[in-house]
A protein has these predicted regions:
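Class I SAM-dependent methyltransferase SAM/SAH-binding core
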Residues: 1-39
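A short hydrophobic/small-residue beta-strand
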Residues: 8, 82-83
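A short acidic, Gly/Pro-enriched loop at the edge of an enzyme's catalytic core
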Residues: 37-49
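A short SAM/SAH-binding and catalytic strip from SAM-dependent methyltransferases
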Residues: 47-64
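A short glycine-rich, Lys/Arg-flanked "PGG" loop and its adjoining helix->strand segment in the class I
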Residues: 64-81
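SAM-dependent methyltransferase
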Residues: 83-150
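C-terminal lobe and adjacent flexible extensions of AdoMet/dcAdoMet transferase-like proteins
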Residues: 144-185
Length: 185
């Protein structure tokens, strides 16, 4: 977006991620540490807010999801647009690969995936130079209906929903993604 001449602000909760991203910062591209559950430092400043690649759904309390939508809405100018990309839980669960080993760079990554209490978990274990590593991720399986409720409660109106990065029509059974477009009045 910045390469298209747009002014871009981006944030992440992780200081180390922002430290790495700041290597790319310039006059039109700024990075900062921020918790999406809190109001943005710049209110009503953005024509468009993007949330891509399932960078949502990591909170245990649904109130935090609602607070995040308030933050999105608060950052938008009037007539602004929120574009949010999230996994389609129906598709993901129907096509879940419970266990696999991926060989990359001379390392075998052992990956396990499972659903538990409304969350999708992924465990990754591997060994490198005699050292064992183990990581676990979890993301809430948020339904289309819940997203629509969060957005409506934040004062956003629904504009469109597509099912993948080619912007194909959304189908609950076959679309891998839910990419929402909401507007701020």
């Amino acid at each position: 977006l910045q390469q298209l001449g747009l002014q871009v602000d981006a944030f992440d909760l992780s200081p180390s991620n922002i430290e790495e991203a700041n290597k790319l910062a310039n006059d039109q591209l700024h990075f900062f540490v921020h918790d999406i559950r809190e109001p943005l430092p710049k209110q009503e400043q953005y024509n468009v807010v993007f949330n891509f690649f399932t960078s949502f759904g990591y909170f245990d309390d649904p109130i935090d999801n609602a607070r995040s939508f308030q933050t999105f809405a608060g950052g938008l100018k009037s007539q602004g647009t929120l574009v949010m990309d999230f996994l389609n839980p129906t598709y993901i669960l129907a096509n879940l690969i419970p266990e696999e080993t991926v060989h990359q760079g001379g390392i075998d990554f052992h990956i396990k995936r499972w659903e538990e209490k409304g969350f999708l978990y992924k465990s990754i274990t591997f060994e490198d130079q005699g050292q064992a590593y183990s990581f676990q991720e979890k993301v809430e399986l948020i339904s289309k209906e819940d997203f629509l409720r969060y957005a409506e409660a934040a004062g956003l109106h629904f504009m469109n929903l597509v099912g993948d990065y080619t912007l194909a029509k959304f189908d609950a059974q076959t679309s891998p993604r839910m990419i929402f477009f909401w507007g701020k009045p």
